[in-house]
From Swiss-Prot:
Residues 84-102, 174-186 have a biased composition (Basic and acidic residues). Residues 12-17, 43-55 are annotated as: Required for binding PPP1CC. Disulfide bonds: none annotated. Keywords: Protein phosphatase inhibitor. It comes from Macaca fascicularis. InterPro entries: PPI-2. Residues 1-51, 70-114, 165-205 are annotated as: Disordered. It comes from the Eukaryota. This is Protein phosphatase inhibitor 2 family member C. Gene3D superfamilies: 6.10.250.1050. The gene is PPP1R2C. Functions as a protein phosphatase inhibitor. It inhibits activity of the catalytic subunit of PP1 and weakly inhibits the activity of myosin-associated phosphates. GO terms for molecular function: protein phosphatase inhibitor activity.
Length: 205
């Protein structure tokens, strides 16, 4: 009985077999007509988490949009009271005539001076940025040299420590001979008062 049921089941694997998936859908469709629509609906409802995460746009991200840092443009403010105000402005321009042209020339000159100042400020900013980069590079090279010299410094420190230990060992070897002579002299000096003290004590009783 188990052999007959295992022969009807398709072999499950990672890759889909086109013939087995088609036959299983066909057999399930024959069993119930509504199941085909359910299967299609279920397939369409599958979510791909990686695509959701890739297309999800958080509100805090600005997506590196450029921000315009341009100076405001100069313009003439007109009132929207009607045609009379426009005629008044036109009339004033015709009356002023030369003054208006001079004002426009002055506005153009001020725009040009703003552009020159902006270019100068950009140049100053670029110079400052260049100096900052050069300073960072110089500091990096100094730190790198110090780092690479660290191995040599460690070797030198070990050599100095070895020399200090050797000199201390040499001093210790010389000291025991001197201390042995001092100890014998000190013992002799201590023995002399002790023997005299013993004699005085023996006389008293």
């Amino acid at each position: 009985m188990s052999a007959s049921t295992s022969s009807h089941r398709p072999i499950k694997g990672i890759l889909k077999n086109k013939s087995s998936s088609g036959s299983s859908v066909a057999t399930s469709g024959q069993q119930s007509g509504g199941n085909i629509q359910d299967v299609k609906r279920k397939k369409s409802q599958k979510w791909d988490e990686s695509s959701i995460l890739a297309t999800h746009r958080a509100t805090y991200r600005d997506y590196d949009l450029m921000k315009a840092n341009e100076p405001g443009t100069s313009y003439m403010n007109l009132q929207d009271d009607g045609e009379d105000s426009v005629r008044d402005v036109e009339g004033e321009d015709s009356v002023r005539g030369v003054e208006g042209k001079e004002a426009m020339a002055a506005t153009d000159a001020s725009d040009h001076s703003c552009e020159v100042e902006e270019e100068e400020s950009n140049e100053a900013y670029m110079r400052k940025l260049l100096l900052h980069k050069q300073e960072k590079k110089r500091q990096f090279e100094i730190r790198r040299r110090l780092h690479y010299n660290e191995e040599l410094n460690i070797k030198l420190a070990r050599q100095l420590m070895w020399n200090d230990l050797q000199s201390e060992d040499d001093e210790n070897e010389e000291r025991p001979q001197a201390t042995n002579e001092e100890k014998t002299a000190a013992e002799e000096s201590e023995e002399a008062p002790l023997s005299g003290g013993l004699q005085t004590q023996s006389c008293d009783p």
